[in-house]
Amino acid sequence: MAKNIDQAFQSIRIVGGLLSSKVLQDARRYQLPGQRKEDYAIEPGFTFNEEMGRYWRIAQGRWKEFQQHIERQDLNSHMLAQQEWLLPLLTRVLGYDITPGVTKIIGEREFPITHTAHAGAVPLVLCGADFDLDKGDARFGQEGRKRSPMGLAQEYVNAESHCLWAIVSNGRYLRLLRDNPAMTRPSYIEVDFTKLFEEDNYADFATVWLLLQATRLAPRNHQIEQCWLEQWREKGQDEGERALDKLRYGVADALRELGTGFVAHKKNQALRDKLSNGVLRNL
């Protein structure tokens, strides 16, 4: 499994090839399509820094309150993570309009999605901090079959043609994932909230806000395929392919130069004679 922990992001982990580190860095520098203030629904008269600074303070306060309650045995960890932390984060900080989920049925398969956003276009699986995002649990499965929260979200976006992206979180970690038929090769962006807030990492928070704010996953022209995040992904893939092409041409040029120099060396007269006589071509 490919993992990338870029030094530019201390609390953001890139697993697989969902989005490159460069895309995240470009987002932080406002160098991607759809990064005008109006594209983020920022009111006239306010700047990006003013908005993100306000949301940073709200998130800090919510996280602190969540941490004060998380160890209490008399509270339901599932409800605590949702009500005290994740739903306020998603609605008040990131701007989503969240709807309680219902069990989705596709064919003979059931998907107990906990919440949805953007009129069902973005499924959310939100659970308590005592859930491991990668560990199977009957509450996310079907008829005795266990699923992990991550597995539930991934299987659902793979099966549902109207969805491309999903969000999964247990309150401590949040993952952004996309339709990915290669179930054996996970691909997602993970945010470590504990590290982010304990290290007071505003720069990482700003990147998370620019990446996950509700306008990034909102369908455009009624099509989820045209959302800004999908455009960023495609742009990153195009740039990656061009970089590989340049690398391939560079390697070929280097090999040609190496071969030419080797043949031209004064001690390789015998080799030059064999090449000119066609001896090596017949080997």
Model-identified regions with their sequence ranges:
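Short, basic/polar, glycine-containing "phosphate-handling" surface segments that engage DNA
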Residues: 1-74, 121-283
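Active-site metal-binding core of divalent-cation-utilizing nuclease and nuclease-like domains
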Residues: 31-40, 44-47, 94-121
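Acidic-basic catalytic patches of nuclease active cores, encompassing PD-(D/E)XK
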Residues: 72-101
